[in-house]
Amino acid sequence: LSSFPEFGPGGPPLLVPSDPGSQRGITALDRLPIVDFHKIGILYAAPGQRSEQEILSNTHGSKAYIEFISSLGHLVRLKGSRELDIYAGGLDQENDIDGRWTYLWDDDIAQIVFHVATLMPTSPETDPQATLKKRHIGNDFVKVVFNDSGAEFAFDTLPGDFNFVNIIIQPHTPAGNPWSGPGMTNNAEFFKVSMQCRTGMPEVGPLGAFKMVTGSSLPAFVRQLSLHSNIFAQIYLASVGFEARQGTQKLEYSSNWRKRLQQIKLLKSRILQAQGTALVNSAAAPLDLDAAEASRMFTAWL
């Protein structure tokens, strides 16, 4: 544990009282996740497909598409995943309503669930418009489209209030004699990666017009790009908002880490008030490394 950013002497740790108010504060803190959650839509457009219904109705994709999604993260069984503290982004975790499997990626500070359209149930008889798929993917701020259609993918193919960023992947391996150059092998596959943004949104990420990416680097590159785009879309919503039927709507953006910090500060403030201690704003003391190190030794106060 670190005392950053409070390097200076801050006094002994505060004992949390056992009164109902303080215990409710601890309970509220326990309910806040320790990582940030993200959900990204994944679509496959087969040759000749252009409409929303055609694309959402796909149950499989090309070999390159399968290799791509299988390297985005690890495959997880949805049923029973709630007990493993897995974030499913709204996918059913009990009755396989939204499919049996999905892909998940996580590290120490974030967790991404991918809403993969080809892994969700397709029912042409009972759900010809694939509304069960769209209720999830249509609410994702960022969608990744593996475009094998042979045509340009229109931004509003899946229209919706939360359609902010589309990341388009197109197979682009040169025909005939492959490119030659440093790092390029004769059996390398290449993909053109481009981005579409909602009107009014500034450009985000390193793409520019587009980037050519090898197949081996594609999953990690697109995953990182979609993560940054999803964070940016949330900040954009908080600062600018979006036009809806009710007028301009704004959604506050706050990371789970920030929410936990706010809850800790609130709990600390209540404890100090209960002890009759006034909070006094004072100028920051010069950094004392010895004192900073000593402040990390919590056992010294026991």
List the model feature ranges, each with a label.
Residues 1-302:
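Long, non-globular regulatory segments flanking folded domains
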